């Protein structure tokens, strides 16, 4: 069954909703954005997450030192990196890694040392999707996540199109920039039970 990552969580209530609804991954954004949390805030929220739900830290062009500090302080299970990725960034990390790839039309999939790939729109976190026809996942070495403009109305179609390891949502479960608990529940239900949206 396709796994679900709910990203950009910053409140106790949103974390508890995502966990109780069946999220497999909870994402904390450490890069500058409206969803950014500090390591200290994430460490407190992480206490609400059971061991079978994985904690993911989201970074943009981080140093290895930044990753190691966050892994240690928050107890991250995975790191997700956007932007520049140094050749040795993922080597011998104490947790798993995800490399984000912005799908911009050239069809290029990098040769990555990460454990997973995540395919996203050109502007991550914008709520915009990418042209699914521009991405060929045939023969990928790693399991992959699909992100970029997913919501309760299109996520089942995305799963049918790509058969991904997991789907990732942030703005698609928000209302006016804040996580909407009912949208979180409905999104996860659509993924887990294959209920198509109305649009």
Swiss-Prot record:
Keywords: Amino-acid biosynthesis, Aromatic amino acid biosynthesis, Isomerase, Tryptophan biosynthesis. It catalyses: N-(5-phospho-beta-D-ribosyl)anthranilate = 1-(2-carboxyphenylamino)-1-deoxy-D-ribulose 5-phosphate. It is an enzyme of class 5 (isomerase). It comes from Streptococcus pneumoniae (strain ATCC 700669 / Spain 23F-1). This is N-(5'-phosphoribosyl)anthranilate isomerase. Signal peptide: none annotated. It comes from the Bacteria. PANTHER family: N-(5'-PHOSPHORIBOSYL)ANTHRANILATE ISOMERASE. HAMAP family: PRAI (MF_00135). GO terms for molecular function: phosphoribosylanthranilate isomerase activity. Pfam families: PRAI. One of its GO terms (biological process) is L-tryptophan biosynthetic process. Pathway: Amino-acid biosynthesis; L-tryptophan biosynthesis; L-tryptophan from chorismate: step 3/5. Belongs to the TrpF family. Its EC number is 5.3.1.24.
